[in-house]
Amino acid sequence: TYDGTPFLFARHLARLRQSAERIALTLPFSDDEVLGRVSATIGAADLPGEAYVRILLTRGVGDIMYDPRACPSPTLIIIVKPFVPPPDETYQRGVKISLVSVVRNHPEALNPRIKSNNLLNNALAMQEAHKHGAFEALMLNYRGEISECAQSNFFIVRDGEVLTAPLEAGILPGITRGLVFELGEQLHLPVRETTLRYADLPLADEAFLTSTTREIAPVVMVDDLTIGTGRPGPVTTRLLWAFRGSRVEIEGSRIEA
């Protein structure tokens, strides 16, 4: 939340519905009903600051078997806890990430576009990254292309262009990722999708991560490779400040902003 309001709630909920539809799961509540339940949970938590909100949709109670029809009544779970943002040095100095051996899920096995509760692929990647002392795990897809990070989308900046892998590379359509395209238009910065490979990293002037909880975080190292000058770059900084300047005004309604 920002100022107690769920950030881009409608976009998050739309992605939840789309993900559920991909696995033949129905969210049996309207957007207003879900927002009401989220707001009530935030109120009941009575937190002193901002809240981290997680909405889970399960198939509900039923027999232990592989047939989803055994669980006909979905269960909605809303988790609210205090939000602890990354430390200021994340943005002032940037972070190190690690290219891990764990490959992102094949889209024809478990499509990464589905925002699901099955995070084993991501967790294994983060395990390996932590062994390397890294903030995040950078993952390749089954074709050996850069896809995304375990908990974030990934961008590079090269020759004034902001580049990120296409959805077809097998990535999650991140909410903040999408917002970067909008901010790029506002700032007259070209932002586009393109195939990225490890060989593109030494040529990058800057790199950054995006996620709802991390906002836009500069990446200054990938393992032992220094990105650009080794410090947060001007394009990343412009995008971060544009994000922070507009985050409570986006689309002009409390549900969206």
Question: Where do the model's predicted regions map?
Answer:
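Glycine- and Gly-Pro-enriched alpha-helical subdomains that act as flexible
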Residues: 138, 145-167, 172-173
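Conserved alpha/beta cores of soluble small-molecule-handling proteins
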Residues: 1-138, 142-145, 172, 182-257
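Secondary-structure junction motif
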Residues: 176-177
